[in-house]
């Protein structure tokens, strides 16, 4: 597999081999394209109380250790359709707190029917302690392509409290060539827009087994 250069990404966008919408040539790098952060976030309901507590400085300062213990006793269930709470990043910014998983999204629909897309965090964001995904940087061939344009869900977490802003350049997408007969992506997140919670529970049978 070979990674497309920046000029080749531009060429493939013009040819239709790569989908990036909206597209701004100023955001093309040597081998990547910068994607921006959508204002909409999701937080799992079990995790939301921790975000609220940190937002209320008095609660955080009063007994942070108790808060950490309380949250650790409310695990997410991979076999359950876990409810979420919606947040919006205002123009003035929103503080992301350690220990809270924020599901974000890119503003851009990005992908390809011909190449394998992959997202990674920008090094400038990483140097502030911001991670843009946990393990899901790889997109399958066909994800976000012309047949089913899609935004990317970002699994945002931080090492230290960080203020983030809507439409900030948060991550970058790259594209790699493939070998062999293609099997286009047709998974549960095809055509998604905005942040999407885990659909892993769909893999489990009625009794909780896979």
Role assignments for model-derived ranges:
Residues 1-210:
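DUTPase catalytic domain/fold
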């Amino acid at each position: 597999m070979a990674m497309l250069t920046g000029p080749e990404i531009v060429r493939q966008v013009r040819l239709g081999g790569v989908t990036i919408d909206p597209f701004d040539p100023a955001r093309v790098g040597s081998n990547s394209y910068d994607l921006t952060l959508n204002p909409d976030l999701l937080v799992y309901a079990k995790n939301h109380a921790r975000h609220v507590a940190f937002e209320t400085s008095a609660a955080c300062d009063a007994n942070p250790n108790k808060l950490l213990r309380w949250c650790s006793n409310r695990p997410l269930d991979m076999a359950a359709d876990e409810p979420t709470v919606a947040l919006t990043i205002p123009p003035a910014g929103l503080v992301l707190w350690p220990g809270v998983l924020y599901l974000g999204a890119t503003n851009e629909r990005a992908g390809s029917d011909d190449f394998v897309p992959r997202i990674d965090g920008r090094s400038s964001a990483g140097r502030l302690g911001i991670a843009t995904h946990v393990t899901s940087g790889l997109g399958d061939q066909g994800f976000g392509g012309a047949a089913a344009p899609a935004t990317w869900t970002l699994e945002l977490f931080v090492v230290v409290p960080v203020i983030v802003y809507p439409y900030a350049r948060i991550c970058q997408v790259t594209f790699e060539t493939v070998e062999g007969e293609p099997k286009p992506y047709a998974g549960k997140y095809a055509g998604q827009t905005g942040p999407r919670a885990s659909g892993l529970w769909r893999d489990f049978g009625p009794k909780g087994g896979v």
